[in-house]
Amino acid sequence: MRAASLPAVILALGCGRPAAPPGPSPATLAAAESLYLDTRDLRDRIDVLDASGAEKAPDGTTRALLVHRYDSLRPRLATRLAGVDSTSLGADDARALGVMRRTLARDLGEAPAPDTTGTAGAPDCAYDPRTVDATDSLRARIHACYGWTQAHLLTDGDMVDRLTLLGGLGRSEDPEQRRRQFLALAPVWRSMNGENDAGSPYRRLITLEAARSRGRELPAEAQARATGIEPDSLERWLVAILETWRDVTPSALVEPWDWYYQTGRASRVLSARIPLERLARLNDSVYQALGADLTGLRVRYDLAPRDGKTPVAFTTFGGRRPIVPWVFATYRTGGLDNLNELLHETGHAIHLAAIRTRPAYTDWPDADPFTEAVADFIALEVYEPAWQQRWLGDSVPLADGLRGRYGAILLDMSWALFELRMLRDPSADPNLVWARLTQDYLHIRAHPELAWWAMRGQLVDEPGYMMNYAAGAIVIAAIRERTRARHGDFSRGDPGWYAWVAPRLYRYGLERPTREVVEGFLGGPVSPAALLTDLRRMPRTVP
C-alpha cells in the first residue's frame, strides 16, 4: 500500500480541527414536514368542528380526542423544527423550514377551549369604543355585534338575515317596500358605526388601524403587489373601471334601495328556477360538468342556518391528510344570488382540492386577490345568457346579466376605495366618503345621513380584505380571457376544464409566489384590459 501524501493527510485530519457536523439529512427534514402536516391536519379538524358547532367529526372522532392528539404533536413539532439548522439547507428546503416555523408560531397555538357560553343570547353591544385601546379587541367586539345583528333583522314582521333582505330588494316591485326593507338594515349600520359620532365603533377602529399602519405599506397594497398589481396602479385602475361603469350606465340618479332592483333583474327572472332544495344539487352539477367531481374531491358543506354561526361565507381546510375542503355558508332561500355565492365558495374548495406540493407548502395564499379571483372562475358565468339557458332553461338579455355581474363587483371596488381613503384620513366622515364615491361613479343618490356602507363584515374583521375582491375581479377577468384563448369556451360545460386549469393555476399552494403563477399563466403582467372590455359590452339603456 502506498503511503498517503502529506497534503492528503492534512486534508483528512482537517489541520487538527474537529470536522463540522453534518447538515440535516433529507430524511430529517422530511420527517419534520410529515409531523407538520399531521399537526395542521388535526388543527384543521378541530377548527371545522368549532365552526360547525359539532362535538364529533364525521368519522366519529370526538373533539376532546382531536385536541389531545394535537396537544401531543405541537411540542414534538416545535422541537423538530428548532433542531434543524437552516444555514445547512438548500434554498427551497430553507424556505420550506421558514414557512413551517412561521405557521407554527402564528397559526398553531393552543387549541381554543370549547365554547360553553351557548349561542342563544345576543352579545353586549352597549359599550363605549373610546375605552377600548386594543385594536384586535375592538375589532372582535364590533364583529360580534355585527354578526348577531345582521342575522336578526325585522322587516314587515319577519326576521331575516342581511343577505336575504338584500336579495329581496332585487325582487320587490314596490319602491316603498324596497325603501322600508333597506332602512331595516339600520341596526346593522349602527352595530358598526353607532351614530356616526365620536362614539362610532368603526371610526375608533379606523383611527387605531391608521396609526398602526402609519409609515408602512397598507395590507391592501401589499396583497395587490403580490398578485402582480403595483400599488401605484391599483387605485388608478379602480377609478378607471368605476369611470367606465359610470359612462356605460344611465346618468339618472337612483336611490340606494333601487340600485339593488336595477341590478337585480336577472335574479328576479331566474331565481324561481333555483329553489332552496335545488341549490346545492345545481352547484354540484355545474362543477361535475366541468370535470370537478365534488364528492370525489371530498368537498363538505355546512349550509343550514343556526344561531351563533358566522355571518360570512367561507371555505377552509377540514383536513390535509388528505385535503378535505369545507364550505360554510347560510342559506334560508335559494335564488340566483345565493347560487352565485355557493359557486364562489365551491370555487375555493376545488382550488384547495387541487393542491399538489410538499407538506410545508400544502396551504393556499389565503387572503390575497388571486385566491378570491379564481374562486369566481365559474361563479361569474351565472350572468351569461348561454349559461343561464343551459342550466336554468331560461335567460335574460346580456345587458341585464352584466348589470347583475358588475353591480356587486363595482360595489366591492367602491368599498375598497372607501377603506383606502379612510385609512389615509381617519378623521373623515365615513358617510360622506361613501356618499361621494357611490354618487360620482355608480349614479346612486347621496344619503350622507345613512351609514349604508356599514354592512360588510370584512371592513372590521379583516382590514384591507375588500381590496382582494376588487383586485381579484381584475385578475379573474384576465384569467378567464386567457383560458378561452388557450383552452376554449367553458360556459356550457367542459369535462376537461378542471384537469386543464388545476395544474396551471391551483396546484402550487405556497410553492410559487402568486405573482409568478398569475403572470406565468397570463404570459405577462396583469392589466385591467379584459375587465374594461367586458364592461363595454353593456348598452346604456335600461329596459
Labelled PLM ranges:
Residues 13-14:
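C-terminal motif of bacterial Sec signal peptides marking the signal peptidase cleavage site
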